[in-house]
Amino acid sequence: MTDNGTITVEELKQLLEQWNLVIGFIFLAWIMLLQFAYSNRNRFLYIIKLVFLWLLWPVTLACFVLAAVYRINWVTGGIAIAMACIVGLMWLSYFVASFRLFARTRSMWSFNPETNILLNVPLRGTILTRPLLESELVIGAVIIRGHLRMAGHSLGRCDIKDLPKEITVATSRTLSYYKLGASQRVGNDSGFAAYNRYRIGNYKLNTDHSGSNDNIALLVQ
């Protein structure tokens, strides 16, 4: 290290040589999270990804706050304060949207930092909720050897005749209704169906399924 506190090129090379293996593992972890951590592929990696995303918000905010406190000069201090305010507002908006979505669906998936769109499927007397990256006009349902998959998510065993007549897609602002349209049985335990969006409004899910499966949403007053 030189007298002014900077490191030389040789010291930087030695540092990289010593930490090369660790850096490789870090990049490998990034690749695995970015390529395989999806809710409909690998649930374990997806949960790790969500935890990592949750931790990034307070860590990023803390970095900008510390940069403002221990500023190099007033210019960098002002930039750090501005960025801290922006990150704080973004973090606050995430919590507001998440709690609004939770009030609508009563699902912990509402706090997913990756998306605020949730698919809700009433099946076997309960509501199965899964995250979606975008809201579609048509949602397909595929049953392969008695196992239902919808929007890429595995929802367990189901027969084509037991498919719900309605499903919903919730956001922090709206709840969209999808009605069962065309369906076709293939063989004994396989088939496919399509759900078409026909209504959208400010509703919340009705978690009481003692009655009909069709009554899955209530108007928010």
From Swiss-Prot:
Virion surface side: 1-18, 71-78
Intracellular or extracellular location(s): Virion membrane; Host Golgi apparatus membrane
Transmembrane annotation, as ranges: 19-39, 50-70, 79-99
Molecular-function annotations in GO: structural constituent of virion
InterPro entries reported in the protein's UniProt record: M_CoV, M_SARS-like-CoV
Short name of any one Pfam family annotated for the protein: CoV_M
GO cellular component: host cell Golgi membrane; membrane; viral envelope; virion membrane
Record has Glycoprotein as a keyword: yes
Intravirion side: 40-49, 100-221
Disulfide bonds: none
Keyword Ubl conjugation: no
Keywords, alphabetical: Glycoprotein, Host Golgi apparatus, Host membrane, Host-virus interaction, Membrane, Transmembrane, Transmembrane helix, Viral envelope protein, Viral immunoevasion, Viral matrix protein, Virion
Membrane topology: Multi-pass membrane protein
Family per similarity comment: Belongs to the betacoronaviruses M protein family.
Function summary: Component of the viral envelope that plays a central role in virus morphogenesis and assembly via its interactions with other viral proteins.
Misc note: Bat coronavirus 279/2005 is highly similar to SARS-CoV (SARS-like).
Oligomeric form and interacting partners: Homomultimer. Interacts with envelope E protein in the budding compartment of the host cell, which is located between endoplasmic reticulum and the Golgi complex. Forms a complex with HE and S proteins. Interacts with nucleocapsid N protein. This interaction probably participates in RNA packaging into the virus.
This protein's name: Membrane protein
Originating organism: Bat coronavirus 279/2005 (BtCoV)
Primary gene name: M
